[in-house]
UniProtKB/Swiss-Prot annotation:
This is Malate dehydrogenase. Homodimer. GO terms for molecular function: L-malate dehydrogenase (NAD+) activity. Its EC number is 1.1.1.37. PROSITE patterns: MDH. The gene is mdh. It catalyses: (S)-malate + NAD(+) = oxaloacetate + NADH + H(+). NAD(+) binds at residues 7-13, 34, 94, 117-119, 227.
Length: 310
């Protein structure tokens, strides 16, 4: 099993790489790529951790080598959000980075499962898909926007609010991965119930949790540690799927005849990536209105990504 992390020297990339070094199955390879000159040092640093995962670092001119024979590629590369910026402000900076990296994947490991972390995910996932389409190697089952951060935040916030064991909390989150496009389905959380007031307060807290971190770090960064944990969790779901286990997780994927061209759904994962896109079930009146209200924004975000590649 070979996992490549593109953007491994950044805040998310380092946290993610650490968790993969300690969490991937024995015998796995962890390939770290970044344009930052520190990346070989990150690889050396991680290599001192005694686990049976081999680590190698690759600099700016070695993208193809970093990606060769990768089974899974995770992309946290790009510019992080700063105070006053929203995810849309990142598009102009990060769209070009994502395009270049996707072209590298097409050249070196077109059959890999590709997990996209780089914001704005609503628009960067379509860019990757369009690069694959242009090359004639697109497989919708193998391209994912990683929305796990919305799920783990929801789990943490619900457990905190209700005073329950976080290990027992499961919160479905659908839609997109920024602002109001993030839709936690609190009506489907088992074992707890919420008042209308709690739903009205908790939903925007989940949607704006990234801003909460950006502001709390006072210009010193964005959500790197929690995002690293979220991406590692999703990567382990992909690994289990590749190993033949039956895994259901949430991801932003291409959907046919769905709410939008791309939408976060529960998905059954397996050896081909997405084996099945599952229904997100019944929505409450609040959730139905929230979904209908945000679809225009989500579709605009998607169009921006597609148009960038036109």
């Amino acid at each position: 099993m070979k996992v490549a992390v593109l953007g491994a020297a950044g805040g998310i990339g380092q946290a993610l790489s650490l968790l993969l070094k300690t969490g991937l199955p024995a015998g796995s390879e962890l390939s770290l790529y970044d344009v930052a000159p520190v990346v070989p040092g990150v690889a050396v640093d991680l290599s001192h951790i005694p686990t049976a995962v081999k680590v190698a670092g690759f600099g700016a001119d070695a993208l193809n080598e970093a990606l060769k024979d990768a089974d899974i590629v995770l992309i946290p590369a790009g510019m992080p959000r700063k105070p006053g910026m929203d995810r849309a402000d990142l598009f102009n900076v990060n769209a070009g980075i994502i395009k270049t990296l996707a072209e590298g994947i097409v050249a070196s490991c077109p059959k890999a499962l590709v997990g996209i972390i780089t914001n704005p995910v609503n628009g960067t996932v379509p860019i990757v898909a369009e690069v694959f389409k242009k090359a004639g190697t697109y497989d919708a089952k193998r391209v994912f926007g990683i929305t796990t951060l919305d799920v783990i935040r929801s789990e943490a916030f619900v457990a905190e609010l209700k005073g329950v064991d976080v290990a027992t909390v499961k919160v479905p989150v659908i839609g997109g991965h920024s602002g109001t496009t993030i839709l936690p389905l609190l009506s489907q959380v088992e074992g707890v119930s919420f008042t209308d007031e709690e739903v009205a307060a908790l939903t925007p807290r989940i949607q704006n949790a990234g801003t909460e971190v950006v502001n709390a770090k006072a210009g010193g960064g964005s959500a790197t540690l929690s995002m690293g944990a979220a991406a590692a969790r999703f990567c382990m779901s992909l690994v289990k799927g590749l190993q033949g286990e039956d895994v259901v997780d949430y991801a932003y994927v291409a959907v046919e005849n769905g709410d939008a061209e791309y939408f976060a759904h529960p998905v059954r994962l397996g050896k081909n990536g997405v084996e099945e896109i599952l229904s997100y079930g019944e929505l409450s009146a609040f959730e139905t209105k929230a979904k209908n209200d945000m679809l225009e924004t989500l579709k605009k975000d998607i169009k921006e990504g597609v148009d960038f590649m036109a």
